[in-house]
């Protein structure tokens, strides 16, 4: 109702500060859809302030990300999602983000220790020796009770530290002495088949083609 009154005045500038923050998850999705429809026909400029990444990428034509009081990225939502410019941005959108140094052969030497392999022949911008950010989607991380065989180039032993429900799926936090902490996203059925609990020893695997690397 407040939005309808604001739009009825035909303002040239509309400021929405955390417009959906007070709503429950079900209502938020419905109102987000309605808000997106109304904003599509709004002739002025709308500025949305939010801490919700879903809200930002679904409602905005352009996203300005502030971290520590500084602008770290200003780009269309699709660009922010595909190529986040800081670990905070990537994690805000639900991804794993590791800082490191680009190697000469498509590898990334991770800042916290360990080595990450990217797709064969892929040129890592802006080149060897540069500081980069490696981003891995949680759904690209597979979990195993024994060391996996086959094609994965990135395989590490670790321990389950946390299981969190996200909608109809589970996010599993795995720590490892070889690489920084990693989040995998799997189905509850898969978690049950693996018998995952806090403290379960597992192997994590990530295909080289599932690693996205951007320059910092």
Describe the predicted segments one by one.
Residues 65, 108-109:
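Short aromatic-centered micro-motifs
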Residues 81-107, 133-135, 154:
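C-terminal boundary and immediately downstream tail of ABC-type ATPase nucleotide-binding domains
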Residues 113-164, 180-181, 185-216:
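Glycine/charge-rich catalytic "coupling/switch" loops of P-loop NTPases
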Residues 106-108, 175-182:
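Short, basic/aromatic beta-hairpin or loop at an interaction surface
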Residues 1-86:
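ABC ATPase nucleotide-binding domains
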Residues 54, 78, 87, 96-98, ...:
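Glycine-centered loop/turn positions within well-structured domains
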Residues 168-173:
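Short aromatic-glycine-enriched beta-strand elements
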């Amino acid at each position: 109702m407040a939005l309808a009154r604001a739009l009825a005045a035909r303002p040239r500038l509309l400021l929405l500060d955390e417009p959906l923050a007070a709503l429950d998850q079900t209502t938020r999705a419905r109102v987000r859809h309605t808000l997106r429809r109304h904003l599509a026909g709004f002739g002025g400029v709308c500025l949305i302030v939010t801490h919700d990444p879903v809200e930002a990428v679904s409602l905005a034509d352009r996203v300005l990300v502030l971290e520590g009081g500084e602008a770290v990225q200003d780009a269309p939502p699709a660009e922010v999602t595909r190529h986040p410019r800081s670990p905070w941005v990537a994690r805000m959108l639900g991804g794993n983000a590791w800082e490191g140094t680009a190697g000469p052969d498509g590898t990334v030497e991770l800042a916290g220790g360990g080595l990450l392999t990217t797709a064969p022949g892929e040129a890592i911008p802006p080149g060897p020796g540069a500081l980069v950010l490696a981003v891995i989607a949680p759904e690209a991380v597979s979990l195993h009770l024994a060391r996996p065989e086959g094609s994965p180039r990135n395989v590490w032993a670790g321990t389950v530290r946390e299981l969190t429900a996200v909608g109809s799926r589970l996010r599993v936090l795995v720590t490892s002495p070889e690489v920084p902490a990693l989040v995998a996203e799997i189905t509850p059925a898969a978690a049950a088949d693996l018998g995952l609990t806090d403290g379960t020893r597992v192997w994590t695997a990530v295909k080289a083609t599932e690693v996205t690397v951007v320059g910092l």
